[in-house]
Amino acid sequence: MTTPLQLAAATTAMARRGNFIEPHFSLLEDVDAGAPVPIGESMDWERMIDAMEDVLHGERGTARGAARGLNYRIAGKTGTAQIVSIGQEEEYDAAELEERLRDHALFVGFAPADSPSIVVALIIENGGSGGTTAAPVARKIFDYWLLDRNEGSRPPNTNYVATINQRVLEPKHADSN
């Protein structure tokens, strides 16, 4: 089991091309985070980051829908954590499960990909797919941080997750009628 903070710390090391910085909480933007600890070779990090960019910007990326209309590049990874085992001959149908048994949606990423200023790691409990649920929420956070925050706008609405869940789960349920 990994916490969102651990995911954020690992993603920060990726964004910094292998320079790990111990995570800390602060209300300030400019804080001395201590000396970075180098990990691995730069070429290896670039290959991984290219693959993470393809998750959002590649033709077959699992979060390509969340990147539509972007004027900056995000590097990210989606994930889906299964809560209950599904038999080999069975098919997963979220609409048929109690909400508490639905898959968790995960996303980790950073932006802009070439010169990161923000890392996002989120887990949406019982949210379904990381690409269709968590990545769009992360996109809202990235947009706020990179585009809107200096214009005095408010952070993304937390009801956005409920809206996504409705959009993702209701069509499947309607098809079964």
Predicted regions and their residues:
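Gram-negative outer-membrane assembly/targeting C-terminal domains
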Residues: 148-177
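Active-site beta-strand/loop architecture of penicillin-binding DD-peptidases
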Residues: 1-36, 43, 52, 56-152
